[in-house]
Amino acid sequence: MTDFVAYKGSQKHLAYAASKAALENLTLSFAAQYAPLVKVNSIAPSLIMFNENDSAEYQQKALQKSVMQKIGGYEEMIKAVEYLFSSQYITGETIKITGGRHLK
């Protein structure tokens, strides 16, 4: 699993952003190396609410950054992974789960 920060960088979390960008490249490299025997894909979520106990500050931050005006949950990640598993043709791809954050 990568992270949306792999595409935009982070002034506060340089090492984290760099490591997620490296995972993005690793997804591409492994997909090229091991095709057609193995499909290699990843997901890159942005702000996701994992439970209702996430702080109000976290929830407000997520809402402000989403053009969908809602907070994604772990269910969105599960659906993306299921989609990637169900495809016989997709490899070397990353699905961004951002609620449109990349559009702002």
What do the predicted segments below correspond to?
Residues 73-97, 102:
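C-terminal substrate-recognition "lid" of short-chain dehydrogenase/reductases
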Residues 8-14, 69:
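Active-site loop immediately N-terminal to the catalytic Tyr-X3-Lys motif
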Residues 39-49, 85, 96-98:
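Conserved SDR Rossmann-fold cofactor-binding beta-strand/turn motif
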